[in-house]
Regions:
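Catalytic cores of DNA base-excision repair glycosylases
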Residues: 4-7, 12, 16-219, 230-232
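Intrinsically disordered, low-complexity, charged terminal extensions of DNA damage-control enzymes
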Residues: 1-28, 34, 192-379
Length: 379
């Protein structure tokens, strides 16, 4: 693949960025020197993986107040890390960032890109973006925005990711010429603001050099990638209380909610039909003197690969059974500080609101299913 010289083509982009760049809390004031705080760049780049800038900013500020440097994060407990990350999603990022901080606090910052790539959670894009912004290394960082900018500028046919190696070689001299940090962030800024999926070509600093714009093909370059249809699921999410506290699922090492506490739940497809009879009769059939069953309107919780229809409910027991397998009773005062994902945090927040809706027969059947898992004895 023969590509035109990137140095003159991208020169207007660097100047444009100096004039319009957004004031983001992790950006250095001086883009001609190494970043004064590489840790801040690391945190921002990990948070920005699959999360929009506007969402990241408040989380970044809170994070830097609580864990202002590598040593503070490395010394933190896992629960503290997950609690501060709660709500940002993709929780594996928090675990990897914690592990990376421990390695960096112990060994110091690597001296090359391969060393950054060896850190937990740093793939080719994140490592290259960190290298360029923090250390002024001319390492091309190619994410969705950068691929889109390059594909339109050069009128690349097909998926530009297939040309990743050629694009890195094309960009590297321009990074060295215009400043790695400045040009890397300029490409990010252009892709996020003007060269978005629906582009605004009028004010674009690269309009005169853009082949896709000249050829009237910006709407077709790059081609839209088909997205997998998320799997559908329906579940009953239950906050069950007793004199000993709340019944919860402790964090696991892997899976969708790894590192987080969650409420017990039952898949709707695993419950029998509600059948005949009254809600009062169904509640009376529950063990352990169940009282005060409540529910709230449900919602749809969306993950990258999954859509969950959630039916939230709560139930208070008069006595405390043994915790079913995989669950644990947690004292009431500990509940607010537990790290939870958005779905479970939402039910925790609902507990503070009064509900006039009783827990219906299906919800009560779900509670029975949770409590029927080998309750060996009362505590």
């Amino acid at each position: 693949m023969t590509l035109p010289d990137a140095i003159p083509i991208l020169a207007p982009l660097a100047s444009w960025f100096d004039a319009v760049r957004r004031d983001l809390p992790w950006r250095a004031a001086d883009l001609d020197r190494p970043h004064p705080d590489p840790y801040a760049v690391l945190v921002s780049e990990v948070m920005l993986q699959q999360t929009q800038v506007a969402t990241v900013i408040p989380y970044f500020r809170k994070w830097m107040q609580r864990f202002p440097d590598l040593a503070a994060l490395a010394a933190a407990g896992e629960d503290d890390v997950h609690a501060l990350w709660a709500g940002l999603g993709y929780y594996r990022r928090a675990r990897n960032l914690h592990r990376a901080a421990a390695a960096l606090a112990r060994d110091g910052w690597p001296g090359d890109l391969d060393g950054l790539l060896a850190l937990p959670g740093l793939g080719p894009y994140t490592a290259a973006a960190l290298a360029a912004q923090a250390f002024q290394w001319p390492t091309p960082a190619l994410d969705g925005n950068a691929f889109r900018v390059a594909a339109r500028l050069l009128a690349l046919e097909g998926d530009p990711r297939r040309a990743a190696a050629a694009l890195r070689a094309w960009l590297a001299p321009a990074l060295a010429a215009h400043g790695p940090s400045r040009l890397t962030q300029a490409i990010m800024e252009l892709g996020a603001t003007l060269c978005a999926p629906a582009p605004r070509c009028g004010p674009c600093p690269l309009r005169g050099a853009c082949r896709a714009q000249r050829e009237g093909r910006t709407d077709r370059i790059p081609p839209v990638r088909a997205r997998a249809t998320p799997r559908e699921a329906e579940l009953h999410l239950l906050a069950i209380a007793s004199p000993s506290g709340w019944l919860l699922r402790p964090p696991t090492a892997s899976g969708l909610l790894a590192g987080l506490w969650s409420w017990p739940w039952v898949a709707a497809e695993d419950l029998p039909e509600a059948g005949a009879g009254t809600d009062a009769a169904a509640e009376a059939a529950l063990p352990y003197g169940a009282v005060d069953g409540r529910s709230w309107p449900g919602w749809v919780q969306v993950y990258s690969h999954l859509r969950q229809t959630v039916h939230p409910g709560s139930l208070r027991l008069a006595t405390t059974p043994a915790a079913p397998a995989g669950l644990a009773w947690i004292p009431d005062p500990d509940l607010p500080g537990l790290p939870m994902g958005r779905r479970d945090q939402r039910l925790r927040d609902l507990l503070a609101r009064p509900s006039l809706l009783p827990l219906d027969r299906v919800g009560l059947a779900a509670a029975r299913a949770v409590l029927a898992t080998d309750p060996a004895s009362d505590l």
